[in-house]
From Swiss-Prot:
One Pfam family it belongs to: PfkB
Source taxonomy: Bacteria, Pseudomonadati, Pseudomonadota, Gammaproteobacteria, Pasteurellales
Protein's name according to its UniProt entry: 2-dehydro-3-deoxygluconokinase
PROSITE patterns from the UniProt entry: PFKB_KINASES_2 (PS00584)
Gene Ontology CC annotation, any one: cytosol
Organism the protein comes from: Haemophilus influenzae (strain ATCC 51907 / DSM 11121 / KW20 / Rd)
GO MF, one example: 2-dehydro-3-deoxygluconokinase activity
Length: 314
């Protein structure tokens, strides 16, 4: 059995029109990926853990129950009596593109590294095969906590744990572009797989093409690089096995909500990767699940919509 731990934040989601009909759910980039990975995987082959912090309020307790119902291991989700989950509001336009408003500065996840039990979590992470985090996982933390987490991940990487990173660059979460760049450059040398989006990389590093992104990340020392390019699918490269290619998805005519397009792609990819599939097949799986997810509203869609993928993938 392979074990993977996702580090990050899950927030309460409000989705709809301001001062009109809205519906409540939850989501967050790493939790979205963890959920979709757990749903499309066999629990006998892949064990999914989540590392975060929640409050002791009823909403936090209910979210934990939902995660557990999806098969996610929550023993590394810390309980914080002083803070609650963050909140975000999604507003959609006619094309399914979204804008976000956030209330997260005092969220429990922001302070997880300072939790008295976080050191125990770091020690227990030595038992997992893969650790997944994103730029948002880092951005929400106070600066000293970011540095500490990166140091711990670097130490785990040296002991053989694989680190998977999605840059997921959100400018509003950083004091400056340079701050984000400096933080990423501290982590990237320890990363085994970069699962990035070209738009983010272009904003961060001024890459002109997806090939520029591949080459830049390989030069840093990352063995496997996948660049997500929206409707153009994904390109992949493995500098050791000389794998290189592009996987283009089937066109989706009914795009409803792209909130979790990249997150769900990562889940499909990781399901394949953890079962030793080729990078091409991993990307095909990523496209497959993302193509379904974007036809539904919300970060985490009804599990029935992708229930057939477990047998298809496995």
């Amino acid at each position: 059995m392979k074990k993977i731990a996702f580090i990050g934040e899950c927030m309460i989601e409000l989705n709809g029109k301001p001062f009109a009909e809205m519906w409540q759910s939850y989501g967050g980039d790493t939790l979205n990926s963890a959920t979709y990975l757990s749903r499309v995987s066999s629990s006998k082959e892949i064990q999914v853990h989540y590392v975060s912090a929640l409050g002791t309020d009823n909403l936090s307790k209910q979210m934990l129950k939902y995660w557990q119902a999806d098969g996610i291991q929550t023993n590394w989700v810390l309980q914080d009596e002083q803070h609650q989950p963050g909140l975000y509001l999604i507003q959609l336009d006619a094309q399914g593109e979204r804008t976000f408003l956030y209330w997260r500065n005092q969220s429990a996840a922001r302070y997880m590294v300072q939790h008295p039990d976080f050191a125990k979590v770091i020690a227990e992470l030595q038992q997992v095969d893969v650790i997944y985090l994103s730029g948002i996982s880092l951005a929400i933390l106070p600066k000293n906590d970011r540095t500490f987490l990166i140091e711990q991940l670097s130490s785990l990487a040296k002991k053989g744990t694989e680190i998977v990173f999605d840059s997921n660059y959100r400018p509003k979460l950083w004091d400056s572009l340079e701050e984000a760049q400096d933080c990423y450059l501290q982590l990237l040398p320890s990363v085994n797989i970069a699962l990035v989006t070209f738009d983010d990389e272009q904003a961060l590093w001024k890459d002109k093409t997806s090939r520029d992104t591949l080459e830049r990340l390989h030069k840093i020392g990352i063995p496997k690089v996948i660049v997500k390019c929206g409707k153009n699918g994904a390109i992949f490269s493995d500098r050791y096995l000389s794998q290189y290619g592009q996987v283009i998805p089937e066109p989706i005519l009914n795009v409803v909500d792209t909130t979790s397009a990249g997150d769900s792609f990562n889940a499909g990819f990781l399901n394949g990767y953890l079962r030793n599939k080729s990078l091409e097949i991993c990307c095909q799986q990523g496209n497959r699940i993302a193509g379904i997810v974007i036809q539904h509203k919300g970060a985490i869609i009804d599990k029935v919509a992708i229930s057939h993928l477990q047998s298809e993938f496995n």
